[in-house]
Design a protein with these regions (language model features):
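Helix N-cap/coil-helix junction residues
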Residues: 34-36, 58, 122, 153-154
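Short beta->alpha linker loops
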Residues: 20, 44-48, 70, 83-87, ...
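Asp-based, Mg2+/Mn2+-dependent phosphohydrolase catalytic module
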Residues: 1-4, 89, 93-96, 109-188
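Conserved phosphate-coupling serine/threonine residues in phosphotransfer and NTP-handling enzymes
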Residues: 13, 106-108
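Active-site neighborhood of HAD-like aspartate-dependent phosphohydrolases
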Residues: 1-42, 174-175
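Residue-level detector of anion-binding/catalytic polar loops
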Residues: 35, 101, 178
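Helix-loop "lid/cap" segments that line or gate small-molecule binding pockets
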Residues: 28, 48-61, 116, 148-149
């Protein structure tokens, strides 16, 4: 069956965002009087925000809200640390130029995702962008991939997903689409 849709995850797949996210979270944590070690963040990298906060033992809703807001505000100042997977982005661009459909499906917050895609000059390379708040369940649920496939009007068997994380790969597999694990040499 012909592949008609490419879907890529963002963090760790299309772009190595580890250092940019880590530095932004460090600043946000510091501004609320907390600290974040690189080892602690490494264990949580790729989790949805609420799961990250739960893992870090931060239960106060006001502190969580403040961290989320502060991180969103300072994240763009660390975009210089983003490392684009140029081979994958070039492949996606060629596929789209040839008439294929393309999408980003990420657990990242929509505003942060749009800002980062704009920064790397990739906003126009995707027909659809879905973020964490666009679905009820995070990965490993296939909801985000199933939603993209449905909105793009193709079948799962006509879709190829690029993912890096175990939960993302579980979601890709559960969607019924084809998938490829992406490993960036300097991800984390």
């Amino acid at each position: 069956m012909e592949i008609k849709l490419l879907i890529t995850d963002f963090d760790g797949t299309l772009v190595n965002t580890f250092q940019a996210n880590y530095q932004a979270y460090c600043e946000a944590f510091q501004r609320v009087g907390l600290s974040l070690s690189e080892d602690s963040y490494r264990k949580c990298y790729g989790l949805r925000f609420d799961d990250f906060m739960d893992t870090m033992g931060i239960s106060d809703s006001e502190i969580r809200k403040r961290i989320r807001t502060l991180k969103g505000e300072c994240y763009p100042s660390y975009f210089g640390l983003l490392k684009v997977n140029t081979a994958l982005l070039d492949f996606i661009r060629m596929f789209r130029f040839g008439g294929g459909k393309t999408a980003v499906a990420s657990t990242a917050r929509g505003k942060n995702l749009i800002n980062a895609l704009t920064h790397i000059g990739a906003m126009d390379d995707f027909d659809l962008i879905l973020a964490g708040e666009d679905v009820k369940q995070g990965k490993p649920s296939p909801e985000i991939y199933n939603t993209v496939i449905s909105r793009m009007g193709v079948m799962a068997q006509e879709t190829l997903i690029f993912e890096d994380s175990n939960v993302g790969l579980q979601a890709a597999k559960a969607s019924g689409a084809h998938y490829i694990k992406i490993t960036l040499s300097s991800t984390i």
